[in-house]
Swiss-Prot record:
Keywords: Membrane, Transmembrane, Transmembrane helix. The lineage of its organism: Eukaryota, Fungi, Dikarya, Ascomycota, Taphrinomycotina. It is a multi-pass membrane protein. The keyword Nucleotidyltransferase does not apply. It is found in: Membrane. Residues 18-37, 68-79, 123-147 have a biased composition (Low complexity). Residues 80-94, 626-644 have a biased composition (Polar residues). Residues 1-94, 119-174, 623-662, 868-894 are annotated as: Disordered. This is Uncharacterized protein C57A7.05. The chain crosses the membrane at residues 209-229, 241-261, 267-287, 328-348, 361-381, 387-407, 917-937, 975-995, 997-1017, 1021-1041, 1066-1086, 1275-1295. InterPro entries: ArAE_2_N, BRE4-related_DUF2421, Memb_transporter_dom. It holds the Pfam family BRE4. It comes from Schizosaccharomyces pombe (strain 972 / ATCC 24843).
Length: 1337
């Protein structure tokens, strides 16, 4: 039997714990062994635990924590016994615990988790030092002792013997087991092999995804039946088909409370629009002189109107005159135009400001458009025009509310709990992926496949943001259960902290992957030789070091370490080649953006002008350094043999260029065009790149030491902690599932509810104890196992003659371990909250909203906070977060009189009118009036009505977007959605009706079969926005329902059936969106590229604010708790940046007339910002773990106590933000790069100097014992994060320069010169002014 112990959730069943006397345990063990049970043991030294029985479907089994690294093979561990490392195999197991695997699983789900009557006692066996492979074979023969043990009952899968008279038959294809296996396989989205746009199908084929589809499908089918029935069709009026369209636009897919609130606002806005149209109709009638119907018809007859059939009576004749446009007059049309303009502008403004009110505003706009298109035709006061749309809309809204209440109803409490379950499952899966990642070598190809961890973290953050919208309605509804909304929110808040801590794991993967990419065996050897040679032969400071006058302080700038460029006498071919190897890898070493991330000029040939990489520019810019002091005036392109200056562009005289010389003899216009097409931007960031190169030459250039061994040790030491964390999350998920399904079971038995609550509480406490003990053992000794590979290096004194071996890999692993411990602490806080809630809420009850509303009002009146803030840490210095800065008006002082105040208010009001959003609102109102002009003219009103021009008006209003990219995207999606929707509508119509005019039973059956698939697309299909799915489904419904309406309850105009309706629908939609598309470019298009660039610049300002708040947080007297306000800002900013990344795909729809839009640079910039935000949050988390003296040492070491260095960081962020917002270029000389000044303090990089006056002196030299200090571990993690923060700020400046360019050229910058400049500026350098190589890491 292999050493596989912990079954997964699907295979776990009937785990039992017992702690009885040794005699009873021995007899139980003998009986279980005799019955043929198989035993698998794990090591444990836990105290005795109460008996426990876990049945299938309930909480998962509990993993016993161990003191040493165990070989516990779980379902989420990818390593097996045969591939364990020797270090892991040499460890012994103490106090093994026996797992009993029985023959029959529990067939049913039971909520009674503890059944002492069925508990069996298995004795614990003595521990032996043995390999994991021998653990299983000796487990059943060892003697018993008093200890704790676990029992798992799993069905036996032993094969039958060959002479068995009844051999096992292969199950048929339609067997129950085979169908279940196929169903589980198809539930996996990866098994479908679908393109990304269709991955929503398998992801939503579950209970959570199908419930809203079933509810919405029944809702639409009922609405279709109302159209088919003659009586209801007639009652709904001439626009009865709007019933089905409304059921598509607003499907019954949301919980009860949001649906009720949206319905309330829908009625409010809809009837407000109707009241506005009634007022317009009254004023238009007054402008006509308030004529009667008879007088109006007589006037039409006098003007030449002839009734087609006078025998039909007066009503028929007046209706024909109205819809032929005989009563359209200029003054009433102007009144209707003004009212339409104002109403459309108002509802568009509300729609943009409050996205949840999207469809209520859309319905109000439709009501206004219907009234404005038909109102000018009526010569008398007719207030029922708006009711043509309001009546079917209100009827369908009532049906939607009924379906929401009675067909698979769902409360916000239930929906929020379901999202918490999803959050728990995804977090558990993320931790399982971590164990898989650590089992692979970074050098293998599998390591890069774990780059998807970043997307998983993004999905977790998006889920948190979705929960925030549901959180608003938790206490606004009636719900029945054990927990109320505030209790669930308290769990979600701790989950938010935990997920932000898990973001560090994805950065760890990228960091390791980056280090493995920049180090290869061939170049490491050459670069290492060049590095040592550079250290031994460079006697003086470099120019870059001498020019860092803006460093930490004046005393530090005088003793800045040398950069170690090429030796002064390095004129041999070997030193030049070694220097070239360093330069070739320099831009990669510190993660400088390369490969088309900078706009560069081409030096090889004109055809390569736009594709020269940043690395090539760096090498060319540094080429003069190799030539020593004899070529100090070499130009940037000295690498080429000859150069020719043509304007501002350096053109090398290469053969490829000379072959194109004849093209310059073309006519002047064509020649200019050719040269303009071949011309590219000049290089940017050359000065920063050279400083990075110098820093790379100075730092030890060594491959990460023992990286594979460190990760192997990390996997073994953290395996037990990962297992316990995953088990705890599985238990939490089962507890949440139980909470959601335990609402009406045994509703009248409080005794059973309390007993079940005690059982649940006992089990959660067991998981809490096991996880807390595993974390304690990990913090005490296991987290320091990774230092063992470095023990021999610290004992070898010869190694430090040139440099100390880089501890970069160790600090990166420390970074991982620190965040792992922080994440586990977050899980423990969640379990603590669950235990507290289980103790306070053992019985189900009815939660009603009036108490929450009353308490909220009382808290606002008294100034006390509600229950939402009871767990928030109230810091005594929270006033420090209040900003003491504010912007000023450079053109005026603060208002000092009533005249100034009134003038200030008026100026602010007029400025607000011409804001971009308000200008767009006025633009949409103008477009609505322009599209309605044919209805305002007497000659075209009848034609416009007969050809359904109203559809074009509605589509034009809805298609015009604020930015050009959105308008182009909407144009394409509406065209394709209308086309395919019309085809589907015709298929449904002709399938149900054949060649006839419509069969009610056939259409009801076909629509009933098709509507679930249509609603599935409507609910779940998203291509950047849900709009394509809405257009597709609405067009299909309109084609079918309007065809039925035209033949069974025809109005004044009948379009036909099937094809006639479909193609008219397509033409009107195409006409409306084409008008909107053209109008979007008038008078001046507002591009999405500008909006995205400005928003990215705004996020940089927010990052600077978070930087300052964390700096203030670190200087507080009490910093043991994370500031929830800062963490909320971090999460909101992360969601904003993530939405900007998704917004970049929308910008691709915008045409680029001046050149290709550099999308990859914006993606890199957003990704860098997202990483920087996560790093700042990680730094705040690390600050909470440090003692005061270590925290002071950290802030001093990383420069956060130096206002000049902090000012430079904020200046870089502000300059980059201002350049992106305005599009202006940046100076060539900026405070960046900041990384070189990060390494300018004396002493070791990861040890703070000069703190002997601290209460407990901190060591100043790196020692092996220091690596066993938890405070130093957190200190090293803080230094690692601080370096990453500075590096990311530098990268932001580099990318911004590549986008905006540079100005203020500094010619002949001293850093470009050779070492003669060093002797001119710094003739002597004392030894204490330099940094010795062994101080560098």
């Amino acid at each position: 039997m292999p050493t596989s112990g912990a079954p997964s959730n699907l295979d776990r069943a009937n785990a039992q714990l017992s702690n009885t006397s040794s005699t009873e345990s021995s007899s139980s063990n003998n009986s279980s062994t005799a019955s043929g049970s198989r035993h698998v043991k794990i090591e444990s030294n836990r105290v005795s635990l109460p008996p426990l029985k876990i049945q299938k479907g309930s909480f998962p089994a509990i993993r016993q924590p161990t003191e040493s690294s165990t070989h516990f093979q779980s379902s989420h561990s990818v390593s097996n016994a045969h591939n364990q490392s020797p270090l892991n195999q040499s460890q012994s197991s103490a106090n093994p615990v026996t797992f009993e695997i029985a023959d029959e699983p529990s067939p049913s789900f039971n909520h009674s988790f503890f059944e002492k009557d069925n508990a069996r006692d298995i004795p614990q066996q003595p521990s032996h030092s043995q390999n994991p492979s021998s653990s299983s074979s000796s487990s059943s023969s060892q003697s018993s002792q008093h200890s704790t043990h676990l029992q798992f009952q799993i069905p036996s899968n032993e094969k039958k013997s060959l002479d068995d008279p009844s051999p096992r038959r292969k199950p048929s294809f339609f067997s129950k087991s085979n169908l279940k296996r196929k169903y589980r396989y198809l539930k996996n989205p990866d098994a479908w092999n679908l393109p990304p746009s269709l991955q929503f199908i398998p992801k939503n084929l579950n209970r959570k995804g199908l419930k809203p589809v079933i509810r919405a499908a029944i809702n639409s089918w009922i609405a279709f039946l109302l159209v088919l029935a003659r009586h209801t069709n007639r009652v709904l009026g001439m626009s009865s088909f709007f019933v089905v369209i409304t059921s598509i636009l607003v499907p019954a897919m949301e919980p009860i409370a949001p649906m009720l609130w949206k319905t309330l606002f829908q009625f409010l806005l809809l009837f407000s629009a109707y009241a506005w149209t009634v007022l317009a109709a009254k004023l238009a009638t007054v402008a006509r002189g308030s004529p009667s119907r008879e007088a109006s018809l007589a006037q039409a007859v006098s003007e030449g109107f002839v009734c087609p059939d006078p025998s039909q009576g007066f009503n028929y004749c007046i209706r024909e005159a109205v819809f032929q446009g005989y009563f359209v007059r200029p003054l009433p049309s102007i009144i209707w135009a003004l009212f339409e303009f104002s109403a459309v502008a108002l509802f568009i403004r509300l729609k943009m400001k409050y996205p949840p009110l999207n469809f209520p505003c859309v319905f109000s706009i439709i009501c206004t458009a219907v009234s404005a298109n038909m109102g000018p035709m009526y010569p008398y006061f007719y207030p029922r025009i708006g009711l043509f749309f309001i009546v079917p809309n209100c009827v369908q809204t009532g049906i939607t509310i009924g379906c929401t209440l009675f067909i698979l109803p769902e409360t916000c409490n239930h929906a929020y709990n379901t999202m918490l379950c999803k959050l728990t499952e995804d977090t558990s899966s993320f931790l399982k992926r971590q164990t898989e990642m650590l089992s692979h070598s970074p050098a293998s190809s599998h390591w890069a496949s774990f780059s998807s961890l970043e997307n998983e973290i993004a999905n977790l953050k998006n889920l948190l943001s979705k929960m925030k919208s549901t959180e608003l309605f938790l206490d606004m509804e009636f719900s029945y259960g054990r927990l109320k909304g505030e209790d669930l929110v308290s769990i979600q808040r701790i989950f938010k902290k935990t997920i932000l801590r898990l973001s560090a794991f994805s950065y760890f993967q990228r960091l390791i992957d980056h280090n493995m990419q920049i180090y290869d065996d061939e170049t490491i050897q050459k670069a290492g030789e060049a590095t040592v040679s550079s250290w031994l032969n460079t006697p003086a400071l470099s120019a870059a070091s001498a020019r860092t006058s803006s460093g930490r302080n004046s005393s530090e700038s005088d003793r800045v370490s040398y950069f170690g460029l090429a030796p002064v006498n390095a004129t041999t071919q070997d030193s030049e080649r070694n220097g070239e190897e360093i330069r070739r890898l320099a831009s990669k070493q510190l993660n400088v953006p390369v490969n088309n991330n900078f706009r560069t000029v081409g030096y090889a040939s004109p055809s390569n002008a736009s594709t020269a990489s940043f690395n090539d520019i760096v090498q060319r810019g540094r080429s003069h350094v190799r030539t020593g002091s004899n070529n100090s005036e070499a130009p940037l392109a000295a690498k080429t043999s000859t150069t020719k200056r043509n304007g501002d562009l350096l053109e090398p005289q290469s053969p490829s260029l000379r072959s194109h010389k004849s093209r310059l003899h073309l006519p002047s216009s064509l020649g200019k065009f050719y040269k303009k097409r071949k011309k590219s931007y000049k290089p940017v960031g050359v000065l920063e790149a050279q400083q990075y190169l110098a820093l790379e030459s100075r730092l030890p250039f060594n491959k990460p030491q023992f990286l594979d061994s460190l990760l192997s040790i990390l996997k073994n030491s953290s395996g037990d902690l990962f297992d316990q964390a995953i088990y705890s999350l599985d238990a939490l998920n089962a507890w949440l599932v139980e909470l959601n399904h335990d609402r009406i079971k045994k509703i009248f038995s409080k005794r059973d509810q309390k007993a079940a609550g005690r059982d649940r509480l006992k089990l959660i406490k067991l998981h809490y104890d096991h996880l807390s003990q595993a974390l304690h053992e990990y913090e005490r000794e296991k987290c320091f196992d990774v230092r063992k590979p470095y023990e021999s290096l610290f004992q070898n004194q010869d190694v430090q003659q040139f440099y100390m071996h880089s501890l970069r890999s160790l600090f990166v692993v420390y970074y991982y371990e620190s965040h792992l411990m922080q994440a586990v602490r977050g899980i423990l806080q969640i379990l603590e909250t669950v235990i507290d809630l289980e103790e306070r809420r053992p019985i189900r009850r009815l939660w009603w909203p009036l108490r929450s509303i009353r308490r909220s009002l009382l808290s606002q009146l008294t100034g006390h906070q509600g229950d939402y803030d009871e767990n928030i840490h109230n810091d005594v210095d929270k006033d420090m977060n209040q900003s003491s800065t504010q912007p000023r008006d450079p053109d005026a002082d603060h208002p000092s009189s009533l005249y100034h105040i009134c003038g200030y208010r008026l100026t602010k009001f007029f400025k607000s009118i011409f804001r971009p959003m308000n200008v767009f609102v006025l633009k949409v109102g103008t477009l609505a009036v322009i599209c309605t002009i044919p209805a305002f003219c007497r000659s075209s009103a009848g034609w416009y009505y007969r050809n359904r021009g109203l559809w074009a008006v509605i589509l034009a209003i809805m298609s015009l977007q604020r930015f050009t990219a959105d308008t182009v995207y909407g144009y394409l999606m509406r065209i394709f959605g209308t086309f395919f929707g019309a085809i589907l509508g015709m298929v449904i119509w002709y399938t149900g009706s054949g060649h006839g005019l419509g069969n009610a039973y056939g259409l009801a059956a076909v629509w009933g079969a098709a509507i679930p698939f249509i609603q599935f697309i409507r609910v779940h299909f998203v291509i950047l926005t849900p709009m394509p799915a809405v257009i597709f489904c609405v067009t299909a419904a309109l084609t079918v329902t309007y065809s039925w309406k035209s033949n069974h309850e025809p109005g004044v105009v009948t379009l036909g059936i099937g094809w006639d309706v479909a193609y008219r629908r397509f033409l009107t939609v195409a006409a409306g969106i084409t008008v909107a598309f053209i109008f979007s470019f008038l008078p001046q298009p507002r591009t999405a590229k500008y909006a995205v660039r400005k928003n990215i610049g705004n996020t940089l300002i927010d990052i600077g604010s978070i930087h300052c708040e964390i700096s203030n947080f670190a200087r507080r007297p009490v910093h043991n708790h994370i500031d929830p306000d800062i963490q909320s800002k971090v999460l909101n900013l992360s969601n904003t940046i993530q939405s900007l990344i998704g917004r970049l795909n929308m910008v691709n729809f915008e045409p680029s007339f001046k050149g290709r839009w550099p999308m990859e640079k914006y993606q890199l910039l957003c990704k860098t910002q997202l990483e920087l935000v996560d790093l700042l949050n990680s730094l705040m988390t690390t600050i909470t773990t440090l003692e005061d003296r270590w925290l002071f040492a950290l802030l001093y070491r990383v420069g956060w106590l130096d206002h000049k260095f902090v000012a430079d960081q904020l200046a870089v962020l502000y300059m980059s933000s201002n350049a992106l917002q305005t599009g202006n270029p940046l100076p060539q000389v900026v405070p960046s790069p900041l990384v070189d000044r990060f390494f300018t303090t004396s002493g070791d990089v990861f040890l703070p100097p000069g703190l002997n006056d601290a209460p407990v002196p901190i060591p100043k030299a790196m020692e092996y014992e220091l690596l066993n200090n938890m405070q130093y571990l957190n200190f090293a993690v803080g230094c690692t994060i601080a370096y990453a923060v500075v590096n990311h700020i530098d990268r932001i400046m580099f990318i911004t320069k590549s986008l905006c360019g540079e100005i203020f050229e500094i010619d002949k910058w001293p850093f470009h010169f050779d070492d003669e400049y060093l002797y001119t500026c710094h003739p002597t350098n004392s030894p204490d002014q330099r940094k010795s190589p062994h101080d560098l890491v």
